[in-house]
UniProtKB/Swiss-Prot annotation:
The modification N-acetylserine is found at S2. This is Xanthoxin dehydrogenase. It catalyses: 2-cis,4-trans-xanthoxin + NAD(+) = 2-cis-(+)-abscisic aldehyde + NADH + H(+); 2-trans,4-trans-xanthoxin + NAD(+) = 2-trans-(+)-abscisic aldehyde + NADH + H(+). The gene is ABA2. Predominantly in roots and stems, and at lower levels in leaves and seeds. Involved in the biosynthesis of abscisic acid. Catalyzes the conversion of xanthoxin to abscisic aldehyde. The biological substrate is probably 2-cis,4-trans-xanthoxin. Its EC number is 1.1.1.288. Belongs to the short-chain dehydrogenases/reductases (SDR) family. GO terms for cellular component: cytosol; nucleus. It is found in: Cytoplasm.
Length: 285
């Protein structure tokens, strides 16, 4: 292959990697979702945030629109477990922006910590699966009805190291993230026939309010976030680097953009080698 062709291809990449794209992000009012929303908007995307947290979601939109001459961000109140809410959110994006190019399934629950399955609440288990799996499924379903006629699109779901290995969170969380990974691969097989890419990302521990549920009781300190960061650092494979919401957002940006135009059905690990390491051996420790 000609090196000249390669050079011209790379030099033509826009600095705003999502310029003109329309993205719908569930759970975009706080945490990783908020970081994704802000990064996408910075890269030229028109964004729709779907969340239950009206005040926080509205504030994110207001901050994005300061100095803007036109509406490039909307907040939509919606519950990912309710099909009508998701259908309406997709319709809203199309009505206001003309299409839907990108779906980010970020809304999720960690589930209540319970080390003994005999005491695990069925209602807690079902709620976690409803948000993490059913929510992702419904969002994929309704995004697909817009993307299939267009013969293009990118869907990225937030998975986890808990979708690859066991023992890193509540049973409902780990089980649901394994399901999201399987759903991603299954939907990628179908939608690839229509030019639509479907991927997921699996981060290691990120210090967000949602993630604090993963912290074992004996590791909890007066400052919950300090305790979580110390616990994550002690158990990480990659030392000296703390995984942040912005690191995850950058990985999602890569999969959402045309930079990854031939990547589909993939699970991008953002774990510093955590899941490829047998921590019981301690050979290098």
């Amino acid at each position: 292959m000609s090196t000249n062709t390669e050079s011209s291809s790379y030099s033509s990449l826009p600095s705003q990697r999502l310029l003109g794209k329309v993205a719908l992000i569930t759970g975009g009012a706080t945490g990783i979702g908020e970081s994704i929303v802000r990064l996408f908007h910075k890269h030229g995307a028109k964004v729709c945030i779907v969340d239950l947290q009206d005040d926080l979601g509205g504030e994110v939109c207001k901050s994005l629109l300061r100095g803007e001459s036109k509406e490039t961000a909307f907040f939509i109140h919606g519950d990912v477990r309710v099909e009508d809410d998701i259908s309406n959110a997709v319709d809203f994006a199309v009505k206001n922006f003309g299409t839907l190019d990108i779906l980010i399934n970020n809304a999720g629950l960690c589930g209540a910590p319970c080390p003994d399955i005999r005491n695990y609440s069925l209602s807690e288990f079902e709620m976690t699966f409803d948000v993490n799996v059913k929510g992702a499924f419904l969002s994929m379903k309704h995004a697909a009805r817009v993307m299939i006629p267009e013969k293009k699109g990118s869907i990225v779901s937030l998975c986890s190291v808990g979708g690859v290995v066991g023992g890193v969170g509540p049973h409902s969380y780990v089980g649901s993230k394994h399901a999201v990974l399987g759903l991603t691969r299954s939907v990628a097989a179908e939608l690839g026939q229509h030019g639509i890419r479907v991927n997921c990302v699996s981060p290691y521990a990120v210090a967000t309010k949602l993630a604090l549920a993963h912290l074992p009781e004996e590791e909890r300190t007066e400052d919950a976030f300090v305790g979580f960061r110390n616990f994550a650092a002690a158990n990480a494979n990659l030392k000296g680097v703390e995984l942040t919401v912005d690191d995850v957002a950058n990985a999602v940006l890569f999969l959402a953009s045309d930079d990854s135009r031939y990547i589909s059905g993939d699970n991008l690990m953002i774990d510093g080698g955590f899941t490829c390491t047998n921590h019981s051996f301690k050979v290098f420790r």
